[in-house]
């Protein structure tokens, strides 16, 4: 086949808020430490491992790229449409999110509504996504006041976790695959284009592809990245 034998591990990393960005968070949990240490240790105890790679899409793609930046234990990573460019991804969602949560009286009241509801509306999912980010990057509340004016300090906490910010500090990445759809409905193509350009300026080698598509229905991209990851793990071992 196109791909050499490999062990594929697909852990359930959903949280009570749904999303997971794979960083250490006081509210959501120490998911970065879990990936770097706990999961790798468990796998090494069970199997004969020659190396480790990370691949993910959307939040998982974000996790792959930042863990590749911050950890030194991954032999290859692949980021499919991973969160990047927080201004255009999350910042422009604050007004809509604020409107939704204030229907219920605030963030905590909205979360109570979601947990007790028999079903969720489409707008509930997007609101919950932003609140999951707030719990990951800050104190669980939105980085805006009741008039949707940004709290600069709180928003800076979010931006400190944007790959566009992190790449200025963490530049020793393993072999890295990045791709994104040119019609991504969350504007991620703009952030990842900026990251791609900055990595080129910094001389950081990476595989880059922008494909025809959106943020949805992109599982087929794994047909390209998984064989690439396995090949790079073999080269490193």
Regions found by a protein language model. Name each.
Residues 1-237:
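Non-catalytic cap/lid and distal C-terminal segments of serine-dependent acyl enzymes
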